[in-house]
Amino acid sequence: MAELVAAVGVPHSPHYPSQYPKDGPQDTPRTYREVKAHLDAAKADAIVVIANDHFNTFFMNNFPTFAIGVTEAAYGPNDQTKMPHYDFAVQSSLASHMLKTAMNEGFDFSVTQEFGVDHAMLVPLHYLTDDVKTPVVPIWVNTFSAPLPTARRCYALGRMMQGAIRSLPQKLRVAVIATGSFSLEIGGPKVDPGKRNSVPDLEWSKHLHRRIGKAEFDEIVAEATPEQMWKAGNIGGELLNWVVLLGMIGKDKPRYLADHDEKDGHAYAVWRWD
Protein backbone atom coordinates (compact mmCIF):
# COMPACT_ATOMS: atom_id res chain seq x y z
CA MET A 1 0.00 0.00 0.00
CA ALA A 2 1.10 3.58 -0.61
CA GLU A 3 1.92 5.77 2.37
CA LEU A 4 2.19 9.49 3.00
CA VAL A 5 5.69 10.04 4.40
CA ALA A 6 6.16 13.82 4.32
CA ALA A 7 4.33 17.08 3.71
CA VAL A 8 5.85 20.52 3.26
CA GLY A 9 4.61 24.05 2.70
CA VAL A 10 6.82 26.66 1.01
CA PRO A 11 6.58 29.86 -1.08
CA HIS A 12 7.14 30.03 -4.85
CA SER A 13 8.29 33.51 -5.89
CA PRO A 14 9.31 33.47 -9.58
CA HIS A 15 12.24 35.76 -8.75
CA TYR A 16 13.96 33.34 -6.38
CA PRO A 17 15.88 31.19 -8.90
CA SER A 18 17.53 34.23 -10.50
CA GLN A 19 18.17 35.91 -7.14
CA TYR A 20 19.27 32.98 -4.98
CA PRO A 21 21.47 30.07 -6.08
CA LYS A 22 20.50 26.81 -4.41
CA ASP A 23 23.72 26.86 -2.38
CA GLY A 24 23.56 30.58 -1.62
CA PRO A 25 24.13 31.96 1.90
CA GLN A 26 20.90 34.01 2.02
CA ASP A 27 17.96 33.08 4.25
CA THR A 28 15.78 31.95 1.33
CA PRO A 29 18.03 29.22 -0.13
CA ARG A 30 19.21 28.27 3.36
CA THR A 31 15.61 27.64 4.46
CA TYR A 32 14.81 25.70 1.29
CA ARG A 33 17.85 23.53 2.07
CA GLU A 34 16.48 22.86 5.56
CA VAL A 35 13.19 21.70 4.03
CA LYS A 36 14.98 19.68 1.33
CA ALA A 37 16.94 17.79 3.99
CA HIS A 38 13.65 16.56 5.45
CA LEU A 39 12.33 15.56 2.01
CA ASP A 40 15.54 13.73 1.20
CA ALA A 41 15.33 11.84 4.50
CA ALA A 42 11.74 10.80 3.73
CA LYS A 43 12.94 9.01 0.56
CA ALA A 44 9.75 9.69 -1.41
CA ASP A 45 9.02 7.77 -4.62
CA ALA A 46 6.49 10.38 -5.78
CA ILE A 47 5.68 14.01 -4.98
CA VAL A 48 2.19 15.51 -5.13
CA VAL A 49 2.44 19.27 -5.74
CA ILE A 50 -0.49 21.51 -4.78
CA ALA A 51 -0.28 24.95 -6.39
CA ASN A 52 -2.18 27.58 -8.34
CA ASP A 53 -1.77 28.44 -12.00
CA HIS A 54 -1.08 32.03 -13.09
CA PHE A 55 -2.93 31.84 -16.44
CA ASN A 56 -0.13 29.82 -18.03
CA THR A 57 -1.52 26.27 -18.03
CA PHE A 58 -5.15 27.44 -17.98
CA PHE A 59 -6.89 30.68 -18.96
CA MET A 60 -10.17 32.47 -18.30
CA ASN A 61 -12.00 30.57 -21.05
CA ASN A 62 -11.51 27.38 -19.00
CA PHE A 63 -10.13 28.04 -15.52
CA PRO A 64 -10.87 25.08 -13.23
CA THR A 65 -11.54 25.19 -9.51
CA PHE A 66 -9.52 21.99 -9.03
CA ALA A 67 -7.45 20.21 -11.67
CA ILE A 68 -5.10 17.25 -11.87
CA GLY A 69 -2.46 16.31 -14.43
CA VAL A 70 -2.74 12.70 -15.60
CA THR A 71 -0.08 11.80 -18.15
CA GLU A 72 3.41 10.30 -18.39
CA ALA A 73 5.54 13.45 -18.56
CA ALA A 74 5.35 17.24 -18.37
CA TYR A 75 7.68 20.23 -18.50
CA GLY A 76 8.28 23.71 -17.20
CA PRO A 77 8.45 26.51 -16.68
CA ASN A 78 5.79 27.50 -19.18
CA ASP A 79 6.03 31.16 -18.18
CA GLN A 80 8.87 33.71 -18.26
CA THR A 81 10.51 32.64 -15.00
CA LYS A 82 14.30 32.84 -15.27
CA MET A 83 15.27 29.35 -14.17
CA PRO A 84 16.40 26.04 -15.70
CA HIS A 85 14.02 24.15 -17.98
CA TYR A 86 12.90 20.78 -16.62
CA ASP A 87 11.28 17.80 -18.31
CA PHE A 88 9.92 15.56 -15.59
CA ALA A 89 7.94 12.37 -15.15
CA VAL A 90 4.39 12.28 -13.83
CA GLN A 91 3.45 9.42 -11.48
CA SER A 92 0.55 8.40 -13.70
CA SER A 93 -0.70 5.43 -11.66
CA LEU A 94 -1.04 7.59 -8.54
CA ALA A 95 -2.57 10.45 -10.54
CA SER A 96 -5.14 8.11 -12.13
CA HIS A 97 -5.98 6.57 -8.77
CA MET A 98 -6.45 9.99 -7.17
CA LEU A 99 -8.71 11.04 -10.04
CA LYS A 100 -10.90 7.94 -9.72
CA THR A 101 -11.06 8.26 -5.94
CA ALA A 102 -12.01 11.92 -6.25
CA MET A 103 -14.90 11.11 -8.58
CA ASN A 104 -16.16 8.45 -6.19
CA GLU A 105 -15.90 10.87 -3.26
CA GLY A 106 -17.74 13.74 -4.95
CA PHE A 107 -14.81 15.84 -6.20
CA ASP A 108 -14.94 16.60 -9.92
CA PHE A 109 -11.36 17.34 -10.96
CA SER A 110 -10.74 18.91 -14.32
CA VAL A 111 -8.16 16.74 -16.08
CA THR A 112 -5.31 17.77 -18.34
CA GLN A 113 -3.20 15.21 -20.19
CA GLU A 114 -0.84 17.51 -22.06
CA PHE A 115 0.59 20.45 -20.14
CA GLY A 116 3.45 22.48 -18.77
CA VAL A 117 3.62 23.99 -15.31
CA ASP A 118 4.60 27.49 -14.25
CA HIS A 119 6.75 28.82 -11.42
CA ALA A 120 4.22 27.97 -8.71
CA MET A 121 5.10 24.30 -9.05
CA LEU A 122 8.56 24.46 -10.52
CA VAL A 123 10.28 26.90 -8.14
CA PRO A 124 9.67 24.60 -5.13
CA LEU A 125 10.70 21.54 -7.16
CA HIS A 126 13.84 23.37 -8.29
CA TYR A 127 14.94 23.98 -4.70
CA LEU A 128 13.57 20.87 -3.00
CA THR A 129 14.61 18.10 -5.42
CA ASP A 130 17.67 17.04 -7.37
CA ASP A 131 16.70 18.16 -10.88
CA VAL A 132 13.09 16.96 -10.46
CA LYS A 133 14.06 13.30 -10.85
CA THR A 134 11.22 12.12 -8.58
CA PRO A 135 7.90 11.66 -10.46
CA VAL A 136 5.28 14.29 -9.73
CA VAL A 137 1.48 14.50 -9.51
CA PRO A 138 0.34 18.10 -10.24
CA ILE A 139 -2.77 19.42 -8.46
CA TRP A 140 -4.03 22.92 -9.24
CA VAL A 141 -6.31 25.02 -7.03
CA ASN A 142 -7.98 28.24 -8.18
CA THR A 143 -6.68 30.78 -5.67
CA PHE A 144 -7.28 34.15 -7.31
CA SER A 145 -10.03 34.11 -9.94
CA ALA A 146 -13.26 34.71 -8.02
CA PRO A 147 -15.27 32.90 -6.89
CA LEU A 148 -12.65 30.84 -5.05
CA PRO A 149 -13.39 27.47 -3.50
CA THR A 150 -14.11 27.69 0.20
CA ALA A 151 -11.46 26.80 2.74
CA ARG A 152 -13.81 24.08 4.00
CA ARG A 153 -13.98 22.53 0.53
CA CYS A 154 -10.19 22.70 0.14
CA TYR A 155 -9.67 21.04 3.51
CA ALA A 156 -12.10 18.29 2.52
CA LEU A 157 -10.18 17.86 -0.74
CA GLY A 158 -7.05 17.28 1.31
CA ARG A 159 -8.78 14.65 3.43
CA MET A 160 -9.92 12.88 0.27
CA MET A 161 -6.41 13.03 -1.21
CA GLN A 162 -4.90 11.52 1.92
CA GLY A 163 -7.35 8.62 1.69
CA ALA A 164 -6.63 8.19 -2.01
CA ILE A 165 -2.90 7.87 -1.38
CA ARG A 166 -3.37 5.33 1.39
CA SER A 167 -5.76 3.23 -0.68
CA LEU A 168 -3.40 2.87 -3.65
CA PRO A 169 -2.44 -0.84 -3.79
CA GLN A 170 1.01 -0.02 -5.17
CA LYS A 171 3.84 0.24 -2.65
CA LEU A 172 4.81 3.89 -2.89
CA ARG A 173 6.29 6.49 -0.54
CA VAL A 174 4.51 9.78 -1.26
CA ALA A 175 5.47 13.32 -0.25
CA VAL A 176 3.30 16.41 -0.73
CA ILE A 177 4.37 19.99 -1.42
CA ALA A 178 1.92 22.89 -1.07
CA THR A 179 3.08 26.30 -2.13
CA GLY A 180 1.95 29.90 -1.77
CA SER A 181 1.92 33.07 0.31
CA PHE A 182 -0.39 34.06 3.16
CA SER A 183 -0.44 37.82 2.54
CA LEU A 184 0.90 39.40 -0.62
CA GLU A 185 -0.19 42.04 -3.12
CA ILE A 186 1.57 42.24 -6.49
CA GLY A 187 1.03 45.27 -8.72
CA GLY A 188 -2.31 46.16 -7.12
CA PRO A 189 -3.81 49.03 -5.11
CA LYS A 190 -2.52 47.63 -1.80
CA VAL A 191 1.12 47.96 -2.90
CA ASP A 192 3.09 50.67 -1.10
CA PRO A 193 4.19 53.58 -3.33
CA GLY A 194 7.40 52.90 -5.20
CA LYS A 195 7.30 49.16 -4.60
CA ARG A 196 6.40 46.17 -6.79
CA ASN A 197 4.70 44.22 -4.02
CA SER A 198 3.63 44.56 -0.39
CA VAL A 199 2.32 42.50 2.51
CA PRO A 200 -1.09 44.13 3.18
CA ASP A 201 -2.00 42.10 6.28
CA LEU A 202 1.15 41.17 8.15
CA GLU A 203 -0.78 40.32 11.32
CA TRP A 204 -2.89 37.77 9.42
CA SER A 205 0.23 36.12 8.03
CA LYS A 206 1.83 35.98 11.50
CA HIS A 207 -1.44 34.66 12.93
CA LEU A 208 -1.53 31.82 10.39
CA HIS A 209 2.09 30.97 11.16
CA ARG A 210 1.21 30.64 14.86
CA ARG A 211 -1.88 28.56 14.09
CA ILE A 212 0.14 26.17 11.93
CA GLY A 213 2.73 25.77 14.67
CA LYS A 214 -0.03 24.73 17.09
CA ALA A 215 -1.83 22.52 14.53
CA GLU A 216 -4.96 24.69 14.84
CA PHE A 217 -6.19 23.73 11.40
CA ASP A 218 -9.94 23.87 12.08
CA GLU A 219 -9.50 27.45 13.23
CA ILE A 220 -7.63 28.34 10.03
CA VAL A 221 -10.43 26.85 7.94
CA ALA A 222 -13.03 28.87 9.85
CA GLU A 223 -11.07 32.12 9.61
CA ALA A 224 -9.99 31.86 5.95
CA THR A 225 -13.04 33.60 4.50
CA PRO A 226 -13.00 35.15 1.02
CA GLU A 227 -13.11 38.59 2.63
CA GLN A 228 -10.11 37.89 4.85
CA MET A 229 -8.04 36.39 2.05
CA TRP A 230 -8.81 39.37 -0.21
CA LYS A 231 -7.82 41.73 2.61
CA ALA A 232 -4.49 39.88 2.67
CA GLY A 233 -3.81 40.86 -0.95
CA ASN A 234 -4.51 39.74 -4.49
CA ILE A 235 -2.25 36.73 -3.80
CA GLY A 236 -3.83 36.02 -0.40
CA GLY A 237 -5.94 33.18 -1.80
CA GLU A 238 -2.79 31.06 -2.14
CA LEU A 239 -3.46 30.11 1.47
CA LEU A 240 -5.94 27.61 -0.01
CA ASN A 241 -3.05 25.52 -1.36
CA TRP A 242 -1.84 25.19 2.21
CA VAL A 243 -5.37 24.39 3.43
CA VAL A 244 -5.51 21.38 1.08
CA LEU A 245 -2.20 20.27 2.60
CA LEU A 246 -3.54 20.73 6.14
CA GLY A 247 -6.44 18.46 5.26
CA MET A 248 -3.94 15.75 4.35
CA ILE A 249 -1.99 16.14 7.59
CA GLY A 250 -4.68 15.56 10.19
CA LYS A 251 -3.84 17.13 13.55
CA ASP A 252 -0.06 16.85 13.71
CA LYS A 253 2.21 19.75 14.58
CA PRO A 254 5.03 20.43 12.11
CA ARG A 255 8.38 18.82 12.76
CA TYR A 256 10.06 21.90 11.31
CA LEU A 257 8.65 25.44 11.16
CA ALA A 258 10.95 28.22 9.98
CA ASP A 259 10.67 31.71 11.40
CA HIS A 260 7.86 33.73 9.83
CA ASP A 261 9.00 35.72 6.80
CA GLU A 262 7.59 39.20 7.44
CA LYS A 263 9.10 40.68 4.27
CA ASP A 264 7.10 38.44 1.92
CA GLY A 265 4.21 37.16 4.08
CA HIS A 266 4.88 33.44 3.85
CA ALA A 267 6.23 30.43 5.73
CA TYR A 268 8.13 27.14 5.48
CA ALA A 269 6.90 24.04 7.33
CA VAL A 270 7.56 20.29 7.31
CA TRP A 271 5.61 17.28 8.58
CA ARG A 272 7.07 13.76 8.48
CA TRP A 273 5.76 10.27 9.25
CA ASP A 274 8.62 8.12 7.97
Tell what function each PLM region has:
Residues 1-45, 57-156, 167, 189-274:
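Flexible, D/E/H-enriched segments
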Residues 165, 182-186:
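Extracytoplasmic, non-cytosolic globular domains
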